[in-house]
Each structure stands twice: as C-alpha cells, then as structure tokens.
Regions:
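A short acidic, Gly/Pro-enriched loop at the edge of an enzyme's catalytic core
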Residues: 72-81
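Conserved beta-strand signature within the Rossmann-like core of class I S-adenosyl-L-methionine
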Residues: 107-115
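A short glycine-rich, Lys/Arg-flanked "PGG" loop and its adjoining helix->strand segment in the class I
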Residues: 95-106
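A short SAM/SAH-binding and catalytic strip from SAM-dependent methyltransferases
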Residues: 80-93
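Class I SAM-dependent methyltransferase SAM/SAH-binding core
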Residues: 20-71
Length: 165
C-alpha cells in the first residue's frame, strides 16, 4: 500500500483533501493516510467483517458496504479515490474502475494498484486501453511496484484521471 499512498500524497499536498478508500478492508491504507495528516477519509468495502475492523481504527469519517461489480452510487465530493488490493484477475475490472469516477471532483484522480499476476494473466493493459477508449479517461502513470512480496508477486500502480465532461 505504501507506493499507492506515496503517489496519492504527491497528488494531494493539502491535508484537507477528501479521500475515498475504495476496498478499504481492515483500514491499513486509511491508517497510513491518517498518519500523514489526512483526516477526511471515507471507506467502502465489500465485507462487513473487514469494515468492522476498519471501524475499530477510528480514522474514517464514514464507512459503508459497496460492491464494485454491482452499481456503486457516489457523489462527486472526493479529491482522490485510492483503491489498493482490489484489482487482480477479473476481466471486468478495467471497466468496473470507471464507476469510481462518479465520486471524483473535476480534475481529481484515481490511484489504484493491480496484482501483477492478474495484470499479466488477463492482459490488463489491453483491457485498460479498451476501457479508456470506451469511457474516456487519461492513464497518467503505470509503474511497477512491490505488491505481494512474500509470494514474490509484483504489482502495478495506476494513476488515472477522467476526461473533463
């Protein structure tokens, strides 16, 4: 998560920024952000059990359940969305990520990680390009990052901005 948090910090120097931690899990990313001085963090996750653990950290403004493969309703209130450990082997994911754009203020960015094995196995880069052409967004950065280091699986870090409407 550190590479994604570092990227988000470079994009958002203001600690007053409002951030959505999509797929917040137990709250590890939120805690890293909180420790850097960000205090306006909301979290969404698929698992009620994970959300309970995130709630116990007492760092999120709000927490809620959301499934990115279903419909996700977001208001455009976020300066950034960070999504760590969510994207991997599912061919719909490069298309699902555009659902998060609804939560972004104009000019805001999505910072996401992708499991490197999934990136390779389903040819994420090609699918991401198809999604970009279909939905209109700018991939500002794709970089290699450590991911599941104990399993020796690398990852990708993406910085994406929707095109202005």
């Amino acid at each position: 998560p550190h590479a994604a948090v570092d990227a988000l910090e470079r994009l958002l120097p203001s600690r007053d920024s409002v951030i959505l931690d999509m797929g917040c899990g137990t709250g590890l990313v939120g805690e890293l952000l909180h420790n850097l001085g960000y205090h306006h963090i909301d979290g969404l996750d698929l698992s009620p059990e994970m959300l309970e653990k995130a709630k116990a950290r007492r760092i999120y403004r709000t927490l809620g359940e959301a499934d990115l493969t279903a419909s996700v309703t977001l208001d455009p209130v976020y300066d950034a969305v960070i999504c760590v450990g969510v994207f991997s082997h599912h061919r719909s994911q490069p298309f699902d990520l555009v659902k998060l754009f609804a939560g972004l203020k104009p000019g805001a960015a999505l910072v996401a990680t992708v499991n490197g094995k999934g990136w390779r196995d389903i040819d994420w880069e090609t699918l991401l390009e198809q999604s970009r052409r279909e939905h209109g967004f700018n991939v500002e950065n794709i970089s290699d990052i450590p991911y599941l280091t104990q399993q020796d699986i690398p990852g990708k870090l993406l910085v994406i901005r929707p095109n202005p409407s």
